[in-house]
Amino acid sequence: MDIRTTTTTATDWAGDLLALGFFEDQVELSGSLAELDQKLDGILQELIAETEFKGKAGKSAIARISSKSPIRKIMILGLGKAEDFKLDTLRRTAATIARSAKKEKGKTLGISLPLWNNDPTSTTQAIAEGIELALHQDHRFKSNSEDNNDNHAPEQIQLLGLGDQTTAIERAQRICSGVILARELVAAPANVVTPVTLAETARDLAQEYGLDVEVLGQAECEALGMGAFLGVALASDLPPQFIHLTYRPSGTPRRKLAIIGKGLTFDSGGLNLKTGGSGIETMKMDMAGSAATLGAAKVVGQLKPDVEVHFIVAATENMISGRAMHPGDILTASNGKTIEVNNTDAEGRLTLADALVFAEKLGVDALVDLATLTGACIVALGDDIAGLWSSDDALAEQILQAADHSGEKLWRMPMEEKYFEGMKSQIADMKNTGPRAGGSITAALFLKQFVKETPWAHLDVAGPVWADKENGYNNAGATGYGVRTLVNWVLGS
């Protein structure tokens, strides 16, 4: 698939499918559009009239044109109200166009959409992202090659009237490569993606993009006192892997950042075993935070900003065996704090505790962790929105802006300190869970105990890392949520 920009406008373009975007209640044909309609013998105006097209968001229609026309089919799409026009409108519209072109088996596709904020570069990048992400298909585990219909995707896609935007397209493709890596890591089952697989992925990224990588095994983690992380790993037959991947710019870094991703490649719940109806069969995706972390590393390694970034994953499984940690066990984290385990199914925060301590010791300017941490966050915000907790208002605002620019939905949640009272233990410094109410808040407060002074933010991404059905440029399945927000944050820091 070849995506290019061109100075050619819709009036002069020729190919299989021409897609045009219209704002709501702005569908009158004048100027170049009237000229195009005349060239098409009135088909465009006829399509608008027959479908009662008003330009409302999500509405579209397609018409076939006579064989004598240089354009085989034309598609009109509603963009919604002009005042609500965002970059994500372009992504979602481009996704609809790309899927329609694939369905119509059009090999050449022309797209004419309005500029966002009079910015052809951002407009191009958003359209290219929508196309790349919508057309990504994961067929690794299909035995029937007929299930793979990628050969129907358009071969040539031209973004009309945008001039030369080669750099913006390359940037979009690099960003999408990280999202796709994250999607495919999350989508793969736990017998394919293991802690060792994540470590191998990190090594591959290091080799391909010139990053530094260190993978600590159990003995090295024991030497660093990572009792919380290793407590979770006790029952698994697979070795724990503590992954530290580092991007260093060629010159003096402007800032130093750390991104920490939860890396539970399977979560059985431990001795507090997840039962039928608990979603245990979906727990391959409990490493989505680490997938986003590695996906962001892939992008940063290609874009090469002047910021040093550390990517950290404490990877393991949470399993059951005679070696498993028990409810009631006391673990000692690497900062010396003790934790009474009152629920072995609240294990992600235990692995993150040692990862946060490790990251802060690197002397970074800010820490951000991502984790599929709580079902409570899904109850609060639904499937599409991640929660954000932060000890630092400036950092929180940076991440919110990065998410808004990427189109990944994120909502800041309260850090209600008094709720931590419910996590205090009579025999240890804290318990790993609190009362039922406010579960996503108490989880964030638990993590806060393992960060001293460094500005820190926690993203609970349990909802949006997976889509049960197609939604915008996300196909059903793993979404790669978080990669684009992280990349935008790094680039804007």
Curated annotation (Swiss-Prot):
Binds 2 manganese ions per subunit. It comes from Cyanothece sp. (strain PCC 7425 / ATCC 29141). This is Probable cytosol aminopeptidase. It is found in: Cytoplasm. It is an enzyme of class 3 (hydrolase). Its main location: cytoplasm. It catalyses: Release of an N-terminal amino acid, Xaa-|-Yaa-, in which Xaa is preferably Leu, but may be other amino acids including Pro although not Arg or Lys, and Yaa may be Pro. Amino acid amides and methyl esters are also readily hydrolyzed, but rates on arylamides are exceedingly low; Release of an N-terminal amino acid, preferentially leucine, but not glutamic or aspartic acids. Gene3D superfamilies: Leucine Aminopeptidase, subunit E, domain 1 (3.40.220.10), Zn peptidases (3.40.630.10). It comes from the Bacteria. The keyword Zinc does not apply. The active site is at residues 274, 349. InterPro entries: Leucine_aapep/pepB, Macro_dom-like, Peptidase_M17_C, Peptidase_M17_leu_NH2_pept, Peptidase_M17_N.
